[in-house]
Structure formats: structure tokens, C-alpha cells
Amino acid sequence: MMKKLLIVSVKAYQKYISPLSPPSCRYKPTCSAYMLTAIEKHGTKGILMGIARILRCHPFVAGGVDPVPEDFSLMRNKNTSKNAEKA
């Protein structure tokens, strides 16, 4: 139940609030898409992963590819980012 409520909240943000400002996320997938995937994979702990990701998304970071890790972690998935840069 809580998981569904969180997902609906993020989807409402994506549909109604996000379009009001220009795209500014420095990561792929976007921070809101990351949070959705994190919640789907890790349940309510995924919200912590999403918040950590939002805190990492600012003008002083290069950004890049940062998918949701299979195991719960609040850190950026650095191995995937390096592999994406080589490709």
C-alpha cells in the first residue's frame, strides 16, 4: 500500500509539477524516473535512494548514467558510469 502511494506521488510530480520547469537533471535516467525504479525494486527504502540521488544532482557534478543498483545503496553506481563513458 505504501509503495503504491509513493509511486503515485512520483508519477503525479512527473505529470503535473515537472513540466512547469525546464529539464535540469544531470543524470540518466532522470531523478524522478530513478526514484520510481528504486521504489519498485527496493520498496519504501527506495525513497531514501531517490532522495540521495536528488541531493547528488546539482550544477557542480558532471552527471551521466547512474541506474538504480540491484542492492540497496545510497551511493552512486560508479562502475556503471565508467562503463557508459567507454562505450
Curated annotation (Swiss-Prot):
The keyword Transport does not apply. The keyword Cytoplasm does not apply. One of its GO terms (cellular component) is plasma membrane. Pfam families: YidD. Keywords: Cell membrane, Membrane. It is found in: Cell membrane. It is a peripheral membrane protein. InterPro entries: Membr_insert_effic_factor_YidD. It comes from the Bacteria. Belongs to the UPF0161 family. Could be involved in insertion of integral membrane proteins into the membrane. This is Putative membrane protein insertion efficiency factor.
